[in-house]
Amino acid sequence: MSYAVQQIHDLRLVVFAEAGPMLKDENDVSLFIAPAFEHEAGMIVLPVNRLDATFFQLRSGIAGAVLQKFINYRLRVALLGDISPRLAQSCALQDFVREANRGEQVWFLPSLAELEQRLGA
């Protein structure tokens, strides 16, 4: 799996490439957790195009199960990319993203530059 390890401020991140295996459900989480543990990273950065479409259908329960698994392993998650078309289709998803972005464990952000700013705040 293609990824890079980066240090932003005092946090080590595993930044996954745009191309690669999809994160379809909680069974796939270990593919993304292993590199984080290997490099003692505190955050996983994953492009939103690596998330299966069902992730954004909150009724499926996939988003909750996947994100809870990362949190159980004490890993923060930044999901990077434009999800505005999906947000326009779902008030529930808008609420979910807004609440996630208020916290410290899971963030939906448009870019790595925005993540760097947020980590510096």
Label for each model-derived stretch:
Residues 2-121:
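Amphipathic, Lys/Arg-enriched alpha-helical "gate/interface" segment within cytosolic domains
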